[in-house]
Design a protein with these regions (language model features):
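Glycine-rich phosphate/adenosyl-contacting loop at the front of the ribokinase-like
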Residues: 1-60, 68
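Conserved N-terminal subdomain of the carbohydrate kinase-like
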Residues: 25-28, 50-118
Length: 121
């Protein structure tokens, strides 16, 4: 059997909102919204893959569209998801943050309860 590293941790969909101009609270601000794969576990697994290390990634995916997007990202990077958990009806871990016009975080919201599923393995 080929040596590998098992990474246990979260995979998140990171959603960032960045206003074009000075952030005006309690108002709608024109700007850009980006979606990127993230999560500490996923980022460690990604870095290991970039180093050529075989990775088995034990994480939890919900039953939503974010799960498929993140699962595809992990597979494209060559991670083995054979041990990953599918949580039907669960919300895939999501992190939403708003920055100011310079990119400094002003507010973050973390919806990561699905990661608690990993405790019960």
């Amino acid at each position: 059997m080929k040596p590998y590293v098992c990474v246990v941790g979260a995979v998140n969909l990171d959603i960032c909102g960045r206003p074009e101009k000075k952030l005006i609270f309690r108002d709608s601000n024109p700007g850009a919204v980006t979606l990127t794969p993230g999560g500490v576990g996923r980022n460690i697994a990604h870095d290991l893959r970039l180093l050529g290390v075989e990775v088995k990634f034990l994480t939890a995916f919900g039953g939503d569209s974010h799960a498929q997007l993140l699962r595809n990202d992990c597979v494209e990077l060559g991670m083995d998801l054979g041990c990953a958990l599918d949580v039907p009806g669960g919300r895939t871990s999501t992190y939403l943050y708003i920055t100011d016009e310079r990119g400094e975080m002003q507010l973050g919201l973390s919806d990561t309860d699905i990661s608690l599923s990993l405790i019960h393995i």
